[in-house]
Amino acid sequence: MKCSGPSVVPRARSYVVVGACVLVLLTGQGCRESSKPAAGITITLIHQLWSDKGSQQRMNETLKTFTARSGIRVEVLPAPEPAVEQLATWRSLLAGRASVPDVYGIDVIWPEILADEFVDLRTYIPEREIAAHFPELIASYSVKGKLVALPYTMAVGALFYRVDLLRQYGYREPPKNWEELEAMAARIQKGERARGHADFWGYVWPGAPSEALTCNALEWQASESGGTVIENGTVTVDNPHSVRAWERAARWLGSISPPGVVAYKEWDSLNLWQAGQAAFMRSWSFGYVIVRAAGSPTRDRLQVAPLPEGRRGVAATFAATGYGVSRHSRHPREAAMLVGFLSSRDEQRRNCLITGMPPTIPDLYSDPEVVAEYPYLSTHLQVYRKSLISRPSTATGKLYPAVSRAYFEAVHSVLTRKTSAAQAAAALQRNLMQITALKAPASATGAP
């Protein structure tokens, strides 16, 4: 389903472009850098956050500041947009021992997969600077004591809602639980369609078979006490709580959510929301800044709340981006200087004030200017401290991409009515046990 309204989707970059850029650097300027003094060195960086025009312009200014202070130039390589393609590109470059890029953007679920290919940043970054970040993020970016990357920005799953519509339909606050969400979404949707908004929906979210669906479905099932797939060294996904959560989500399709949501990526749901065609949306907390862009119909009509709670309570996955230095870099010290600069308190504060992207340094959440400019960050911090759940990337290590794919494909089969939730959970349990060589809990196998 194609979304209407203003598009905010960044252009995706292809493998070919990335490869061509790397080839030019390896055969030209990149090969000559080793003979230059530190002040003349060029560091190359690859990161998905910088692939759209607006971000490129902002970050170019950041890099100019870094160059002015250090004398080190920085070149940014384009990257593919989807996370799965990014990881494949990163792994291909690293497997070829390419000396560029020097610095890579690292998703919080990748450290276990890529750890062997990156330097330990503790060798180059002072401990006081590392300790300034949320300790949970530092732990997530560490593998056996090795700091693979330093965090730069983060996000948590959150519920976006149209405050004007809630007031119009007599609601004083956002839904506390999934049942309230369903009732409120249905009522507002019915009312808006009666007013002539035929394409209006109650609740939109990314349902395409992708990492975004893994995050969504984990939040559904964990909030209902269904766990996070791999727990205590066992595969736990086949349980009645997960089944119930998936069944509920499947009922949303065609009811309060568009049938086409099963093909929505994150930007699709953001586009629909930004066009004013939905009452509620699940997105990352940083989506607040995107949907408040100049000219957006929802600019002054939205608020952000924690996701609805289930029987267990609220459950929100988190995302984070950090920077790591390739062990194949010819200039690891200078590359680490760039990482330290980008992840520093001053730079994160500046970036947050300009873009609204949540920082990874706790004390910035009490900065008066930051709080005044982006009040949604208080919700972000509340969710982070009370309701956070992790994807099973640490528990599964290098197998995580296969685990996540198996998971989101199983959930997607339920959403598209290809199989029942109970059948999908049972088949997924067997599949994950085969992929990971882990067992089911003793109680699930009939053992005493």
Q: Predicted regions span which residues?
A:
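Extracytoplasmic "Venus flytrap"
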Residues: I43-E61, E81, A395-K398
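Long, aromatic- and glycine/proline-rich binding clefts that accommodate carbohydrate-like moieties
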Residues: S140-Y141, D300-A305, L353-A406, S413, ...
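Hinge/lid segment of periplasmic solute-binding proteins
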Residues: D107-A158, A198-D199, L213-T214, R299-A305, ...
